[in-house]
Amino acid sequence: LGEYINSMDRTNQALRELKATNLRTNQQAISDLSNLLSVGTQNLEEVFRDMCHRDAQPIEPLGFVMKGSDFPRLPSQKTAQLRTIHSQMYNFTSQGSKVDLGPSAKAYAQERGQYITLSLQNLAAASLSTARKVGGADAVYRQGSNGIGTYANGIQGMYIAEYDNICPIFSREEWGQVLYATCQSSLSAFASTLKDLDSHIKNNFITDCYLAYEILEVVTNMSFQIENRTGELKLAISDALKPIRETAKSSLSQLLTDLRTRLQQTHQLPFDGAAVPITSEVMQRLQLMTAYLSPISSIMRSLGDGGWSAPNTSNSNASIPTLKSFDVGADGKQLFAHYSTDTIETLMSNLESRSRALLKGKSLQGVFIANNIAVVERMIRSSDLASLLSTAAQPKLDAWKKKASQLYTDTWRDCSQILLDVQYTSKTP
């Protein structure tokens, strides 16, 4: 290889000298040497491609992820050889027109890009298969039950390993371009997988909206780690995540809308004033959301306080999350508390409206409201909601308890006034 490159160097030097003479009689020699140099460059490209191909057999990333092991890198001896070939090809092709990627960079991106895509395809398939409903259509998504976390870890490990391969072979100004070209195919497959997951979430919105929050957190953390090590790919990953991010943003208002619709379509309430199942369902939803405070806080910050009532997604292109936006902090907890109290207020106000229409007598309506408030309070106290809602929700809960008490005692008001009427008479002299 060294002798071949030296021969090409001599040919290249001769070509430069002939071009410098600018004599018409040298044009045939210049043409012959240019063709010879072109053939030599093509041969070097084939050698470069073949060397990349030898170490591009697909691997199974799951084993590396489960063991926490580093993903394989190219041997240092091979990267040195590849760098030598690339440097020569870059010098030869630089005499022609400038292109975004040289022949060797394109060959590297094709061979290594295919290796990454094929290696990750099983993790992509697992992410889709684990999203399928197992416990019935009403089964609520359980945190960590989808394979997206393993898929993201596989992408992160392989991209960082590939960046470590690229740096010794190519010049610094080429690192970003070569990395993007190498990862482009697997990024497209990743974006396609996220679109399929987004469709699944939309089809099972009430039970699987939590999967959108999990994907948002997992993929954003992956993006931060890759950017921290490579300085690249953040925008590309953010574009792939966009459908999930928009679905997660719209979920907050859609859940409230679904709650109103379900309650307004209720045509029967317990005749004894017992609490209705939807109250427990709503509180369980809020309990589950506490496990996703980080991504939900990021969503709420982008919407603004109260923005879930009338979300504006027209500026979604500007909502690329930052590391700071995923820090829950005091304001994140406060936003979640406001959303939770809005949810509880929506629940209770619609329950009161339906009780007036479906239950006879204010006392029964009062019992109904009191029983539902009792469920709300109990489920707050018995979960992580206690620390988040103790200050924000209690005044509103107290107001509803007072209203329930007033409704219950309203029937007895006239009677109690008569029974408790006291007349004082003065003693006779």
Segments from the language model and where they lie:
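Long alpha-helical rod scaffolds of large eukaryotic non-enzymatic complex subunits
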Residues: 1-429
